[in-house]
A protein has these predicted regions:
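Structural motif
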Residues: 29-37, 86-89
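Alpha-helical ds-nucleic-acid-binding substructure associated with the helix-hairpin-helix region
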Residues: 20, 53-127
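Intrinsically disordered, low-complexity, charged terminal extensions of DNA damage-control enzymes
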Residues: 1-31
Length: 127
């Protein structure tokens, strides 16, 4: 279902939603192309306030300012480096595991070619 079809459906089944839909602009979503970065960002943001997660993610990105945020460069950093920017040991472990899964081919580079169910089944195998 695309956005337009979803908005039409919501408008037809919920009068309050119809008012909101008519009042505000249609949402715009930016499609992510760097799936590795999206997964890492999700890990960092889990169970944190938006403000805290944003600060930690900003520090994380500064480690890769030259555009080198990829599985290999993530693995090259030490646990201590990640701890120093505010990541918990558990999140560091998850991030390393995702990076390792990318480098060993467990996670395909072209996630956009896979269905939701295939992606979910792949990701739940990683701890």
């Amino acid at each position: 279902m695309n956005i337009d079809a979803g908005l039409i459906h919501l408008s037809s089944v919920d009068h309050k939603m119809e008012k909101l839909i008519n009042k505000f602009e249609k949402p715009y979503f930016v499609k992510e192309n760097n799936y590795f970065e999206s997964i890492v960002r999700s890990i960092i943001y889990q169970q944190l306030s938006t403000k805290s997660a944003s600060k930690i993610y900003g520090r994380f990105n500064k480690l890769f300012e030259n555009g080198s945020l990829n599985p290999e460069s993530v693995i090259e950093q030490s646990n201590d480096t990640y701890r120093s920017i505010g990541l918990s040991r558990q999140k560091i472990s998850y991030i390393f595991n995702v990076a390792d899964a990318y480098t060993n081919g467990m996670i395909p580079q072209n996630f956009d070619k896979y269905g939701d169910e295939d992606i979910i089944n792949t990701l739940i195998q990683i701890k």
